């Protein structure tokens, strides 16, 4: 495995930290065994030539425990009379960092309770092994580190250490990873990548299995990268918390109290030397799933957002755990578009540019790859899927445009720009090809609501004229054809509304044998009679639920059955309430009022509070008679679309429209 330049390490990515550490370890091993002297000499030559480059490397990319492991290896090399330069400025910095780290976790503490130093024992002198062996993991390792465990075996001849190493040497055909297992980390990050790439719908059983596996390992103190760990970290805990909560599992936000110092700072590990960008990034993402009253998540959101904003302002968004294609882009999107406002297709379109596939490299004790998390197959499939959806959306948009023109909706005040934005919001929220009926029903419903509102307001219709419009719709909803099929109506806008509802109802009747015409008409009658009071969200939710039936578990539950469910009424009330406030907020913003937002995603305190309550209603499972998750998600989907319109300025929305619908 020696590379052409005499070094050992990751062949695909050059990191001087990785190459020096691996090369010195291999040279020490070969010299100890007194074999392959020519390879040893090539390795020494590489180190003599490149040791001075340590001070050129970005310290954020220093491998885990490097500041402890390298000095220990150098001490061993000196005993073996291996001639390598040790007086470089970069090495002096490494030694200084070692002292800082060892002071953060004193020797007496590391012998009493599990700490991250268990992961980096190799070469440390003066250890009390009889005490450390009591901190051994269940699998025989020292915090799942083969190298740390190998050093322990060398010092103690412990049978469990030998068993751990032997099992993994056989498993990996003579070698071992830098850390193993990584089962929780792998399960969580694979799910996260599939979701952000827009592929999760293809792997729902596998994802449910992954999430259930993580839930079985969950503890009130959190988790780390592997099961049965006595040490927890905020990165895996935050990702686990977020995904478990999204999938309906009950997890307490109090878990994050274990990662908060007395001074109010959040940390990944106790005694850490530096703060990881991705750890704070995932804490920030987790905090956006907060429920009412979860003050620890309010603190977490504030701390992580401030940390990330400061890093971004300094152009310092480098991470100590991963070298990825566009981490600044990922963090920037999260800060600029909070989760409430993040429409699924928008997130996926940006992430397709940010995801590095095979080229993303993780930083552990050495550089390593996570093929189930980062691979080109995911990226290739995601791009194919996105392009397929985009092509369908573009065709639907052309059909919407034809419908708009044939119905002369422009004469009633509906502009083509508003038409495009309305369709885009529906398509970016409900994007799947198989949900075309729901998407088009949403788009046409929203378009007609805006058109009718514009007609009523800007034509300055009298109360009697509005009443006549509503009466005509209420009493004339059965299609009548005369003169060779030409549709007759006193009001062409009423005619368009009636035809649209009949068309939507007929689609469902033909596809699923379900007649939704009457409940759809009832929903419109309710909106028309109270349009000045809002009610847009209620009409959209009812339309979406009627078009999608009762969800996957209870396909085509009746409107009466849905409405009789107490959870349905709670969701409807919460959605209407927050959407009405968002509509008012948007109107004030457009009119130059006092609506304001800050970088943590705030609109108003009241709106944020009500969004948290809605999220809680949607993601929690109340009982076996709970609504289907797809139906519950419809409420949140509509609310998030309102939040998006209120949060993003018009320039941002226009940019998103171009990128999501039209950019290849």
Swiss-Prot record:
Q: What is its EC number?
A: 5.5.1.13
Alphabetically ordered keywords of this record:
Chloroplast, Isomerase, Magnesium, Metal-binding, Plastid
- Chain residues that bind Mg(2+): 233, 235
Give the EC class as a word.
isomerase
Q: What is the lineage of its organism?
A: Eukaryota, Viridiplantae, Streptophyta, Embryophyta, Tracheophyta
Residue numbers covered by motif DXDD motif: 233-236
Q: Which InterPro entries match?
A: Isoprenoid_synthase_dom_sf, Terpene_synth_N, Terpene_synth_N_sf, Terpene_synthase-like, Terpenoid_cyclase/PrenylTrfase
> Which GO BP terms sit in this record?
gibberellin biosynthetic process; miltiradiene biosynthetic process; terpenoid biosynthetic process
Any one Gene Ontology cellular component term annotated for this protein: chloroplast
Cofactor(s) needed, names only, are:
Mg(2+)
Q: Which residues bind substrate?
A: 101, 320
**Name assigned to this protein:** Ent-copalyl diphosphate synthase 5
Which reactions fall under this protein's catalytic activity? Answer: (2E,6E,10E)-geranylgeranyl diphosphate = ent-copalyl diphosphate
Q: What's the chief localization of this chain? A: plastid
Tell me its family: Belongs to the terpene synthase family. Tpsc subfamily.
Subcellular location(s) of the protein: Plastid, Chloroplast
Which spans of this chain does the record mark as coiled coil? none
Pathway the protein takes part in? Secondary metabolite biosynthesis; terpenoid biosynthesis
Tissue localization of expression: Ubiquitous expression in roots, stems, leaves and flowers.
The further comment given in this record reads: Abietane diterpenoids (e.g. miltiradiene, abietatriene and ferruginol) accumulate specifically in the periderm of roots. The ent-kaurene diterpenoid oridonin, main constituent of Isodon rubescens, accumulates in leaves.
Record's function text: Involved in the biosynthesis of ent-kaurene diterpenoids natural products such as oridonin, miltiradiene, eriocalyxin B and nezukol, known to exhibit antitumor, anti-inflammatory and antibacterial activities. Catalyzes the conversion of (2E,6E,10E)-geranylgeranyl diphosphate (GGPP) to ent-copalyl diphosphate (ent-CPP).
* Molecular function GO terms recorded: ent-copalyl diphosphate synthase activity; magnesium ion binding; terpene synthase activity
Domain observations? The Asp-Xaa-Asp-Asp (DXDD) motif is important for the catalytic activity, presumably through binding to Mg(2+).
- Matching PANTHER family: ENT-COPALYL DIPHOSPHATE SYNTHASE, CHLOROPLASTIC (PTHR31739:SF4)
């Amino acid at each position: 495995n020696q590379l052409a330049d005499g070094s050992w390490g990751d062949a695909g990515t050059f990191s001087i930290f990785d190459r020096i550490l691996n090369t010195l370890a291999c040279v020490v091993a070969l010299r100890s065994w007194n074999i392959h002297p020519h390879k040893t000499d090539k390795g020494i030559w590489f180190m003599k030539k490149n040791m001075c480059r340590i001070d050129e490397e970005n310290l954020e990319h220093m491998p885990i425990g490097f500041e402890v492991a390298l000095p220990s290896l150098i001490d061993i090399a000196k005993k073996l009379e291996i001639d390598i330069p040790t007086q470089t400025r970069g090495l002096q910095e490494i030694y200084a960092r070692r002292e800082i780290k060892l002071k953060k976790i004193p020797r007496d503490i590391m012998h009493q309770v599990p700490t991250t130093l268990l992961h980096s024992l190799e070469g440390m002198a003066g250890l009390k092994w009889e005490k450390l062996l009591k901190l051994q993991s269940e699998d025989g390792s020292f915090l799942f580190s083969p190298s740390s465990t190998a050093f322990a075996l060398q010092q103690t001849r412990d049978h469990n250490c030998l068993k751990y190493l032997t099992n993994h040497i056989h498993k990996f055909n003579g070698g071992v990873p830098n850390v193993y297992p990584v089962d929780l980390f792998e399960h969580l990050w694979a799910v996260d990548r599939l979701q952000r790439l827009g592929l999760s719908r293809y792997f729902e059983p596998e994802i449910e299995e992954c999430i259930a596996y993580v839930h079985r390992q969950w503890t009130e103190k959190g988790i780390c990268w592997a099961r049965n760990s006595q040490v927890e970290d905020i990165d895996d805990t935050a990702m686990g918390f977020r995904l478990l909560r999204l999938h309906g599992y009950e997890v307490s936000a109090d878990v994050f109290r274990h990662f908060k110092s007395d001074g109010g700072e959040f940390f990944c590990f106790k005694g850490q030397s530096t703060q990881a960008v991705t750890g704070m990034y995932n804490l920030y993402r987790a905090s956006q799933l907060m429920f009412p009253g979860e003050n620890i998540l309010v603190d977490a959101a504030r701390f992580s957002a401030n940390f990330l904003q400061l890093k971004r302002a300094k152009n310092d968004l480098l991470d100590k755990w991963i070298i990825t294609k566009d981490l600044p882009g990922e963090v920037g999107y999260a800060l600029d578009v909070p989760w409430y406002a993040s429409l699924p297709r928008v997130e996926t379109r940006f992430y397709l540019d940010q995801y590095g596939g095979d080229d993303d490299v993780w930083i552990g004790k050495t550089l390593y790859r996570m093929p189930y998390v980062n691979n080109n197959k995911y990226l290739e499939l995601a791009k194919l899927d996105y392009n397929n959806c985009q092509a369908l959306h573009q065709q639907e948009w052309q059909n919407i445009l034809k419908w708009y023109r044939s119905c002369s909706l422009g004469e009633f005040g509906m502009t083509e720009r508003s038409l495009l934005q309305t369709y885009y919001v529906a398509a970016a929220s409900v994007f799947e090809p198989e949900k075309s009926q729901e998407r088009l029903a949403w788009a046409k419903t929203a378009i007609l609501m805006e058109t009718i509102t514009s007609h009523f307001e800007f034509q300055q219709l009298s109360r009697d004229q509005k009443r006549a419009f509503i009466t005509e719709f209420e009493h004339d909803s059965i299609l009548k054809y005369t003169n060779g099929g030409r549709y007759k109506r006193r009001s062409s806008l009423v005619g368009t509304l009636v035809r649209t509802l009949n068309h939507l109802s007929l689609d469902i009747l033909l596809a699923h044998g379900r007649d939704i015409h009457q409940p759809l008409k009832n929903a419109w009658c309710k909106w028309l009679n109270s349009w000045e009071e809002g009610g847009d969200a209620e009409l959209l939710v009812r339309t979406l639920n009627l078009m999608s039936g009762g969800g996957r578990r209870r396909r085509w539950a009746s409107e009466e059955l849905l409405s009789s469910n107490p959870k349905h009424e709670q969701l409807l009330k919460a959605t209407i309430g927050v959407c009405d406030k968002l509509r008012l907020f948007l109107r004030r913003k457009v009119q130059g009022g006092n609506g304001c937002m800050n970088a943590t995603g705030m609109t108003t305190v009241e709106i944020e509070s009500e969004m948290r309550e809605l999220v809680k209603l949607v993601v929690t499972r109340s009982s076996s008679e709970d609504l289907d998750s797809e139906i519950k998600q419809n409420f949140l989907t509509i609310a998030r679309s309102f939040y998006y319109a209120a949060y993003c300025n018009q320039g941002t929305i226009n940019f998103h429209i171009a990128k999501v619908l039209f950019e290849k």
